[in-house]
Swiss-Prot record:
It comes from the Bacteria. It comes from Shigella boydii serotype 18 (strain CDC 3083-94 / BS512). It catalyses: 5-methyltetrahydropteroyltri-L-glutamate + L-homocysteine = tetrahydropteroyltri-L-glutamate + L-methionine. The lineage of its organism: Bacteria, Pseudomonadati, Pseudomonadota, Gammaproteobacteria, Enterobacterales. This is 5-methyltetrahydropteroyltriglutamate--homocysteine methyltransferase. Pathway: Amino-acid biosynthesis; L-methionine biosynthesis via de novo pathway; L-methionine from L-homocysteine (MetE route): step 1/1.
Length: 753
């Protein structure tokens, strides 16, 4: 019985974000296509070599993508929307970039494809578009070229291919509606062709990713798997690969498939190894996803060994990362500023490869000494004073139902707020951030690098805040913001000011295309050593008689956009953050700030993959928000902001937040999103976004008025606010001024009737 190890994929961007820099240089016209392609080749060769040197037996090939792997699969199948096609019908790398970002160095610009979250991760994929009667053919041979590349370098190659059913599941029908599952028989011949080409190259195993098999799929989709895989069998061995959840609910469907192996995520799923071994066909290989591919923690390898050792010798076994290492930073060894103790608790992608090598060797030999040595720091961490703060744990344990209740119901609060603020009908505001100019970024960077002292930095930030207030007063906005000049990122800023978080220098992970993020890491109990936002909010308020909003990022969003601890529940982390920010609300209130916004853009995206698990998550997610906000007095107005395209299925929870005002992203849906609020009879105030901040286009007064009138047909006008869709951080001042002037004018026109 063989024991091997492998990874499901490796980060693409490069340690120094070389791919990002090459992409952006090419898009800007500063480098050639050949130079871009050369960077890709160099990164792939380096990453294969690094995995091999770290002890990986089977190397993933096909995990590299120029923008996104789902988009790569779409091109492989010839699925190019008409608006992005080349006149001669050819497909090239610019076709791919036009789908991903709407434009490329060649070809006509056209609207980019929709982008959405890859399952429950912070990675985004480009949504495939389907139209009735479309044809599929093998069009983009990137996978085959990269397999040839890796074979020429002498590597042991395992191609990675997104499976046909999951690819269809991830897409959307455009135009005339039809069942996208009906396209399955049209795409299978392309998959057969690709597998035949791989067989010609002497490939033994192909990793075929079907993560949709962890979802609660409709029966018709589950039934589609058997005929699909019947059509694909017999050319090469197929490792059916799942991740992000367990497979037990769909195991009957899986075990009927003509594949030769199954990969299971044993980190995020609840599947028992003994049960899997019992139910899988005896000649199947089991790939055990034991090492967490989407976090940064060193594994306790003694625990992982115990989890899997009983099936050693009973079937072919591969040990693996739970999912692709795409979701982890690349290399811990280049982090020079982390405290030695804290650093010993982490493992990034390359260190996770080393963990897989240690685990394979121990399972082969039975000698676990190296596992014990590797696991010692993570075991010692359990007793570290950096992890446990008795005061935080005591405060969390003492929470009562009263702590998540405002003193009075919305109707009573609204009366007190009207008396305090005396706002006009159709009150105007913005979501929080103003353009982050080069001057602002340079100021922050100089301060961070030590090239600017604290006094000069503070003077500079104060000047930018003052400018933001002057601009808003000139425009005639009713509720102002300070503009967030001091903040680099809405999560990082709070993480830097809370105990229990650490930051990396190079811990970049890909979000989409060329965009990378560097998430904070929650290492211990979270608390607030000092006020975070009060000073600048108070300063901004001193410059105007109009109310200035205090701006906080909510507890669930901070949790979802960070690497969480693994030793406590996500609920515990969210509530600890909520308690820390509750103190911030109290301090803002004491400083005279009467309107406080708590942003929760990630509340919906944190939903578990299975709907049957939603209620428990939403219950604690809502409770965390309410703990954060409930300390506010009746005449303090609590706002929240959310940017989703779907509210229907969580409307109860949105209402349960009990925010006085919710601002939402609605302009791109032409106010259709408000239907959910109307049907639910949402009781509080709403600010439906009246223009799309992601576009530099300036909306006309008439267009904004028309949207607001449409909104007033669904929600009583006295409960409507007027605001953009989202923060204005990425926009320039000229279009920001023009758009806000038109927005204010539209509100004034409506007041006049």
């Amino acid at each position: 019985m063989t024991i091997l190890n492998h990874t499901l994929g490796f980060p693409r961007v490069g340690l120094r974000r070389e791919l990002k820099k090459a992409q952006e240089s090419y898009w800007a016209g500063n480098s050639t296509r050949e130079e871009l392609l050369a960077v890709g080749r160099e990164l792939r060769a380096r990453h294969w070599d690094q995995q091999k040197q770290a002890g990986i037996d089977l190397l993933p090939v096909g995990d590299f993508a120029w923008y996104d792997h789902v988009l790569t699969t779409s091109l492989l199948l010839g699925n190019v929307p008409a608006r992005h096609q080349n006149k001669d019908g050819s497909v090239d790398i610019d076709t791919l970039f036009r789908i991903g970002r709407g434009r490329a160095p060649t070809g006509e610009p056209a609207a980019a494809a929709e982008m959405t979250k890859w399952f429950n991760t912070n990675y985004h994929y480009m949504v495939p578009e389907f139209v009735k009667g479309q044809q599929f053919k093998l069009t983009w041979t990137q996978l085959l070229e990269e397999v040839d590349e890796a074979l020429a370098l002498g590597h042991n190659v395992k191609p990675v291919l997104l499976g046909p059913v999951t690819w269809l599941w991830l897409g959307k029908v455009k135009g005339e509606q039809f069942d996208r599952l009906s396209l399955l028989n049209d795409i299978l011949p392309v998959y057969q062709q690709v597998l035949a080409e791989l067989e010609k190259r002497g490939i033994e195993w192909v990793q075929i990713d079907e993560p949709a098999l962890v979802l609660e799929l409709p029966q018709a989709w589950l039934d589609a798997y058997k005929p699909a895989y019947d059509a694909l069998q017999g050319q090469v061995k197929l490792l059916l690969t799942t991740y992000f959840e367990g497979v037990t609910p769909n195991l009957d469907t899986i075990t009927a498939l003509p594949v030769q192996g199954l990969h299971v995520d044993l980190v995020h799923g609840k599947d028992g190894v003994a049960e899997l071994h019992k139910r899988l066909p005896s000649d199947w290989l089991l790939s055990a996803g034991l090492i967490n591919g989407r976090n940064v923690w060193r594994a306790d390898l003694t625990e992982k060994y115990a989890q899997i050792k009983d099936i050693v010798g009973k079937r072919d076994l591969w040990v693996a990362s739970s999912c692709s290492l795409l979701h982890s930073p690349i290399d811990l060894s280049v982090e020079t500023r982390l405290d030695a103790e804290v650093k010993s608790w982490f493992a990034f992608a390359l260190q996770k490869c080393h963990e897989l090598a240690l685990l394979r060797d121990a399972l082969k030999s039975g000698d676990t000494a190296a596992l014990a040595e590797w696991s010692a720091p993570i075991q010692a961490r359990r007793h570290s004073t950096r992890v446990h703060n008795p005061a935080v744990e005591k405060r969390l344990a003492a929470i009562t139902a009263q702590d998540s209740q405002r003193a009075n119901v919305y109707e009573v609060r609204a009366e007190a707020q009207r008396a305090r603020f005396k706002l006009p009908a159709w009150p105007t505001t913005t979501i929080g951030s103003f353009p982050q100019t080069t001057e602002i970024r340079t100021l922050r960077l100089d301060f961070k690098k030590g090239n600017l002292d604290a006094n000069n930095y503070r003077t500079g930030i104060a000047e930018h805040i003052k400018q933001a207030i002057v601009e808003q007063e000139r425009l005639g906005l009713d509720v102002l913001v300070h503009g967030e000049a001091e903040r680099n990122d809405m999560v990082e800023y709070f993480g830097e000011h809370l105990d229990g978080f650490v930051f990396t220098q190079n811990g970049w992970v890909q979000s989409y295309g060329s965009r990378c993020v560097k998430p904070p890491i929650v290492i211990g109990d979270v608390s607030r050593p000092a006020p975070i936002t009060v000073e600048w909010a108070k300063y901004a308020q001193s410059l105007t008689d109009k109310p200035v909003k205090g701006m906080l990022t909510g507890p669930v969003t901070i949790l979802c956009w960070s690497f969480p601890r693994e030793d406590v529940s996500r609920e515990t982390i969210a509530k600890q953050i909520a308690l820390a920010l509750r103190d911030e609300v109290a301090d803002l209130e004491a400083a005279g700030i009467g309107i406080i916004q708590i942003d929760e853009p990630a509340l919906r995206e944190g939903l578990p993959l299975r709907r049957s698990d939603w209620d428990a998550y939403l219950q604690w997610g809502v409770e965390a928000f309410r703990i954060n906000a409930a300390v506010a007095k009746d005449d303090t107005q609590i706002h929240t902001h959310m940017c989703y395209c779907e509210f229907n299925d969580i409307m109860d929870s949105i209402a349960a937040l009990d925010a006085d005002v919710i601002t939402i992203e609605t302009s791109r849906s032409d106010m259709e999103l408000l239907e959910s609020f109307e049907e639910f009879d949402y009781p509080n105030e709403i600010g439906p976004g009246v223009y799309d901040i992601h576009s530099p286009n300036v909306p006309s007064v008439e267009w904004i008025e028309a949207l607001l009138k449409k909104a007033a047909k669904r929600i009583p006008a006295e409960r409507l606010w007027v605001n953009p869709d989202c923060g204005l951080k990425t926009r320039g001042w000229p279009e920001t001024r023009a758009a806000l002037a038109n927005m204010v004018q539209a509100a004034q026109n409506l007041r006049r009737g």
